[in-house]
C-alpha cells in the first residue's frame, strides 16, 4: 500500500515526462499474465520524479540482481508467494515486477529518513519487492542497510562485500545458516548434520557455515569421473568433515562406517538437510539418531520424500519443510541478525560466495532480454545481471 501511495506521488509513465523538470529514467522487467518467461516477460520503461521525493521514501539504483529458480516459478505462476500486480509504474494493465533478490545503492533519501545516506548499499527487507529493474522508489523501511566496501574498510575489516555477495546474500546463505541454527541445538566438536545435494550452492554454504560453527558435516554427492577432485575441493576449500556418494548413502553396509565417525566425536547426527527427495532422502534420514530432524527445502529429483514407518515409531524422526521466505516474512529482526552474521564472515574472508555468471546491462538495450537470456542460461549456473 505504501509503495502505491509513493507511486502516485513520484512516479510517472514516459508519456508525461515533459511536465517534470528532473526525472530518472528507469526500466523494469514485468509480466501481466503467468506463463513461460520468453512468452510473457516485457520491458516497462517509466520515470521517477527526483524533485518531489516523499519525506519517508528513498530512491535506489540496482547494482545487481540474480535469476533464482523461485523467480522463474513466480513468472510461471506455480510459486506459492506471488507479487502484487499494479499499474503504479504507468502500465496500461496491472503488471508485476519480477525478482526477489538484489543489491541496491541509495541515490536519494527523503527528509525523514535517518537510517540511510546517499551511497549506502541495501537489500530488500521483505519479499516480492521486484528487483529486476534499474531503479526503485520505495519506503526507507523497505530496505535493509548492508555495508559498502568503503564502510567495511573504514571499520577495519579485511574485505568489503562484492556485488555478487551482496546481490545473492538474501536466499542461499540465509537458508543454510537458518537451517543449521534455528531448529536443532548442535554441540560444536561433537554433533553432526548430514545433507544431500552437497555440491549445490546451499550445500556448499551449509558446509562452510557448519565448519565455522564447529559442527561436523556429511555431504552426499553424485558419483562422477572427477569425484576425488570434488571431494578434495569440498574438504579443503569448504571444510567438509566427510563426503560420501549417493551409492554409499544408500548402502546399509556403509552405515557402520558412518556410525564409527560419529562415535569418535561422542556426538549424534541430529539434523538432515534434504533438497533431493526420493530414495536419497530416505538414505540421509536413516543416518539420523533418535529424535533427529530432517528439513526439506527442495525436491530436485521431483520424487516424494520417503520415510519408513519404523523411523517414526522406533527413532521418533521428525520430517518438516523449510521455506526461508515464510520464516522471515514476519520476522524482520531475525533476517537482519542473520544478514549481520553472514556479512561478518564475508568481511573477514571466512565465507566464500557461490560464483555467478555476471552479465553487464547496457542501458540502451531492453532489460527483459537480459533476464530471458539469464533464465535460459541458468541451467548452467547462477546468472547475475549487473548494472
Swiss-Prot record:
Active-site residues per Swiss-Prot or TrEMBL entry: 79 (proton donor)
Positions with a binding annotation for NADP(+): 172, 199-202, 222-224, 297-300, 322-324, 382
GO cellular component, one term: mitochondrial matrix
Principal subcellular localization: mitochondrion
GO terms of molecular function: enoyl-[acyl-carrier-protein] reductase (NADPH) activity
Transit peptide: first to last position: 1-23
One Gene Ontology biological process: fatty acid biosynthetic process
Compartmental location: Mitochondrion matrix
SUPFAM superfamilies, per the entry: GroES-like (SSF50129), NAD(P)-binding Rossmann-fold domains (SSF51735)
Pfam families (alphabetical): ADH_N, ADH_zinc_N
CDD domains (UniProt xref): ETR (cd08290)
UniProt entry keywords in alphabetical sequence: Fatty acid biosynthesis, Fatty acid metabolism, Lipid biosynthesis, Lipid metabolism, Mitochondrion, NADP, Oxidoreductase, Transit peptide
This enzyme's EC code(s): 1.3.1.104
UniProt catalytic activity: a 2,3-saturated acyl-[ACP] + NADP(+) = a (2E)-enoyl-[ACP] + NADPH + H(+)
Top-level taxon of origin: Eukaryota
Protein family per UniProt: Belongs to the zinc-containing alcohol dehydrogenase family. Quinone oxidoreductase subfamily.
Complexes and interactors: Homodimer.
Function in brief: Catalyzes the NADPH-dependent reduction of trans-2-enoyl thioesters in mitochondrial fatty acid synthesis (fatty acid synthesis type II). Fatty acid chain elongation in mitochondria uses acyl carrier protein (ACP) as an acyl group carrier, but the enzyme accepts both ACP and CoA thioesters as substrates in vitro. Required for respiration and the maintenance of the mitochondrial compartment.
PANTHER family: ENOYL-[ACYL-CARRIER-PROTEIN] REDUCTASE, MITOCHONDRIAL
Protein name: Enoyl-[acyl-carrier-protein] reductase 2, mitochondrial
The species this protein was found in: Debaryomyces hansenii (strain ATCC 36239 / CBS 767 / BCRC 21394 / JCM 1990 / NBRC 0083 / IGC 2968)
Gene it is expressed from: ETR2
